C-alpha cells in the first residue's frame, strides 16, 4: 500500500518471461551444433580466405608446383627402375668424388686385383655412392679373408684393411689337398708349394682333430719333428708316417703312455733308425715291430744260414 492508501502489486511481466525462454533456446541450439576440431578449423578458414581473395597467391606458384610434381615422379621412376645409384654415381663423380686411389693392407695371400674386382672400381666409381656394407659382404667371401674394414677418405681414396686366415696344415681327403685353419675349417685348395712345410693330415675327420692331436705331441718333439703325415684311421685313432718311411700305429686310448714307450724304444734300441716298416703300439700288453721287405729277407737268409750251420754241427758230432 502506498501513502495514498493504494495497494502496490509486483508486475511479473509475461514479455520478460518469453525473452528468457528465447535466450535459453538459443543457448541449447548452440550447444547442439557440431564443433570442428582445431586443425580442421584452420583448413576451413584457409579455404574460405583463399576463396574470398583475402590470401594472395604469388606469381609462378603453379609452374613451380608442376615442376616439383614432375620431378617427384621422375625420382620415383628412377627408384623403381633401379637407376638412382647410377645417377648418383655420375653426378658425384663429375663433381670430383670419383675413386682414384685404393690402399689395401693386410693382404698376404689375397691379391689387390681380387679386391678391385669385387669393389667394382672402374675409374668412374663415386666415393659418395660406394656402399661400404655391400663391399664388405663381398670381400669377406674371398677364401683367405676373415674380416675386413673399409674406410672412405674424402675426396678420392678408399682404405681396405684385411684380416686373413692362418693356414695350420694341409688336409688330404681323397685325391684333393686343402689348406685348413687350426679349427679345421677349410681355407682353400692347395695351389702353391710354399705351404709344403705345413703338416699333412690324411683321412676323414682328420681336419677337425688335427690341432688337438698335434698339441698332444708337444712333449715328444723328437717324434713330432720326424712326422711326415698324420693319418686318421676310421675316425678313431692315428698313424704316424715318419720321414724314413716307418709307420707308427698308435692306440685309440692311452696315447701318452704309447708315445712314452716309443720314445724309450728309440732311445734304447734305436728302433726308429733300423730297417723297420712299422711299430704297432695299439695293444697295451705287447709291441709288434714289422721289418721292411729287405730286412725281412736278410733276416730270413741269416736264419736259414744259422739253421744249416746247426745241422752241420750236429752231423759232425
From Swiss-Prot:
GO terms classed as biological process: cell septum assembly; FtsZ-dependent cytokinesis
Stretches assigned to the POTRA domain: 97-165
Disulfide bonding pattern of the chain: none
Transmembrane segment boundaries: 64-82
Organism domain of life: Bacteria
Gene Ontology terms: cellular component: cell division site; plasma membrane
Primary location class: membrane
This protein's UniProt keywords: Cell cycle, Cell division, Cell inner membrane, Cell membrane, Membrane, Transmembrane, Transmembrane helix
Residues on Cytoplasmic side: 1-63
Localisation: Cell inner membrane
Periplasmic face residues: 83-317
Topological relation to the membrane, as annotated: Single-pass type II membrane protein
Pfam families for the chain: FtsQ_DivIB_C, POTRA_1
Role according to the record: Essential cell division protein.
PANTHER family in the record: CELL DIVISION PROTEIN FTSQ
Family statement: Belongs to the FtsQ/DivIB family. FtsQ subfamily.
Protein name stated in the entry: Cell division protein FtsQ
Species annotation: Agrobacterium fabrum (strain C58 / ATCC 33970)
Amino acid at each position: 500500500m502506498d501513502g495514498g492508501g493504494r495497494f502496490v502489486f509486483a508486475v511479473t511481466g509475461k514479455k520478460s518471461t518469453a525473452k528468457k525462454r528465447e535466450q535459453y533456446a538459443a543457448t541449447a541450439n548452440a550447444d547442439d551444433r557440431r564443433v570442428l576440431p582445431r586443425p580442421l578449423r584452420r583448413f576451413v578458414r584457409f579455404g574460405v580466405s583463399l576463396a574470398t581473395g583475402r590470401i594472395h597467391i604469388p606469381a609462378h606458384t603453379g609452374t613451380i608446383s608442376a615442376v616439383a610434381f614432375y620431378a617427384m615422379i621422375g625420382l620415383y621412376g628412377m627408384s623403381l627402375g633401379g637407376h638412382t645409384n647410377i645417377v648418383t654415381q655420375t653426378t658425384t663423380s663429375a663433381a670430383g668424388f670419383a675413386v682414384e686411389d685404393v690402399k689395401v693392407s693386410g693382404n698376404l695371400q689375397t691379391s689387390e686385383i681380387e679386391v678391385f674386382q669385387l669393389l667394382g672400381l672402374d675409374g668412374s666409381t663415386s666415393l659418395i655412392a660406394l656402399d661400404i656394407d655391400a663391399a664388405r659382404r663381398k670381400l669377406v667371401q674371398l677364401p683367405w679373408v676373415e674380416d675386413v674394414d673399409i674406410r672412405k677418405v674424402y675426396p678420392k681414396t678408399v682404405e681396405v684393411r684385411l684380416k686373413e686366415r692362418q693356414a695350420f696344415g694341409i688336409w688330404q681327403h681323397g685325391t684333393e689337398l686343402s689348406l685348413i685353419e687350426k679349427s679345421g675349417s677349410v681355407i682353400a685348395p692347395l695351389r702353391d708349394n710354399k705351404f709344403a712345410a705345413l703338416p699333412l693330415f690324411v683321412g676323414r675327420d682328420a681336419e677337425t682333430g688335427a690341432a688337438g692331436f698335434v698339441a698332444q705331441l708337444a712333449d715328444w718333439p723328437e717324434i713330432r719333428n720326424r712326422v711326415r703325415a698324420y693319418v686318421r684311421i676310421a675316425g678313431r685313432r692315428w698313424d704316424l708316417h715318419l720321414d724314413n718311411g716307418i709307420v707308427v700305429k698308435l692306440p685309440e686310448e692311452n696315447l701318452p703312455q704309447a708315445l712314452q714307450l716309443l720314445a724309450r724304444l728309440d732311445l734304447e734300441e734305436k728302433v726308429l733308425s733300423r730297417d723297420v716298416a712299422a711299430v704297432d703300439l695299439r695293444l697295451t700288453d705287447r709291441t709288434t715291430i714289422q721289418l721292411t721287405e729287405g730286412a725281412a729277407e736278410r733276416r730270413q737268409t741269416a736264419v736259414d744260414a744259422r739253421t744249416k750251420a746247426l745241422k752241420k754241427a750236429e752231423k759232425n758230432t
